[in-house]
């Protein structure tokens, strides 16, 4: 994933709210690769600042602590992920294009963005111990489940009768495969993305009546 570039982020007064919001977004996306390398347990804002090439003061200006930085960055990245896959779903002209497109998209995500996506599972695990992560997890999971609402709606529009009509069940199923093959990819299994692609296509076949 291409990271946003930050030429200069000044510690200006908080009177220009729209500008501050955009700078906060740029900073979080710029720091995302560093967060992905470290994970929540090992990260601290000083390390993130050094790895990202921005001052610690700038990070503290926009984020109170590492929890806020991590959750904000994960939500931003997942927003783009959800937007892209839902665009693909809505544009599919037929069931074969839909299943192939979704399978390719998810497999390519595992191949190219595994480190960033593991941050989501890191955040989800932290939410079991720290209430500060609850809002982030609820927001992201709602958006992820909505992908499967869009998928089932599209299949119905294309005339496909499905055995499963509960988007939550489909989310849990595909998310389980996603996490498994993501872990295999991170362990160095070069075949993981293609194996995931095959598994998603199999699930599509099982889904149709």
Regions found by a protein language model. Name each.
Residues 26, 30, 34-68, 72:
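Helix-turn-helix
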Residues 30-37, 84-88, 119, 123, ...:
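Solvent-exposed, amphipathic alpha-helical segments
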Residues 35-38, 58, 140-148, 177:
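Anionic, Ser/Thr-rich low-complexity intrinsically disordered regions
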Residues 132-138, 142, 155-208:
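Hydrophobic/aromatic-rich alpha-helical bundle segments in the mid-to-C-terminal region
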């Amino acid at each position: 994933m291409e990271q946003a570039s930050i030429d200069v982020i000044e510690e200006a007064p908080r009177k220009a709210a729209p500008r501050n919001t955009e700078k906060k977004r740029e900073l979080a996306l710029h720091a995302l690769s560093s967060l992905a390398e470290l994970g929540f347990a090992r990260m601290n804002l000083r390390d993130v600042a050094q790895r990202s090439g921005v001052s610690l003061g700038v990070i503290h200006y926009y984020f109170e602590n590492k929890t806020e930085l991590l959750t904000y960055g994960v939500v931003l990245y997942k927003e783009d992920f959800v937007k892209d896959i839902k665009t693909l779903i809505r544009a599919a002209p037929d069931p074969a294009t839909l299943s192939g497109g979704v399978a390719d998209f998810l497999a390519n995500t595992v191949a190219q963005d595994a480190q960033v996506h593991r941050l989501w599972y890191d955040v989800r695990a932290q939410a079991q111990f720290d209430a500060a992560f609850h809002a982030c997890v609820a927001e992201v999971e709602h958006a992820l489940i909505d992908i499967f609402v869009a998928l089932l709606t599209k299949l119905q529009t294309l005339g496909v009768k499905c055995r499963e009509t509960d988007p939550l069940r489909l989310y849990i199923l595909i998310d389980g495969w996603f996490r498994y093959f993501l872990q295999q990819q991170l362990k160095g299994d070069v075949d993981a993305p293609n194996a995931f692609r095959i598994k998603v296509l199999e699930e599509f076949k099982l889904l149709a009546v």
